């Protein structure tokens, strides 16, 4: 069962403001919580990122909006089922090119 989705907006140092603008716009439009802006890789993520937590029933609408409003940013989205490894490998959607994740944290 899917509890919710995470949409991680990836960014480099020169894209922080663009990522903040996208996160703020998603929060204003959909009311989704926006997490901390990590300026360095954290968890399995290969570079700076911020997490949007999206209710399952709202994900379709938010995903469509992110696909058309992300600009040049990459967004990694995944379901939250309780199986962290599967959620980060099998239950994923990439908006933009995919990037390798550090899956060793799930060992």
What are these regions (language model features)?
Residues 1-107:
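Long, contiguous binding/interaction regions
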């Amino acid at each position: 069962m899917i509890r919710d989705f995470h949409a991680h907006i990836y960014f480099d140092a020169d894209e922080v403001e663009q990522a903040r603008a996208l996160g703020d716009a998603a929060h204003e439009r959909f009311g989704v919580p926006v997490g901390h802006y990590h300026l360095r890789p954290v968890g399995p993520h290969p570079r700076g990122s911020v997490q949007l937590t999206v209710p399952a029933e709202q994900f379709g609408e938010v995903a469509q909006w992110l696909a058309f409003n992300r600009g040049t940013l990459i967004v990694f989205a995944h379901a939250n089922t309780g199986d962290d490894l599967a959620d980060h490998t099998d239950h994923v959607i990439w908006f933009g090119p995919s990037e390798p994740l550090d899956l060793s944290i799930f060992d």
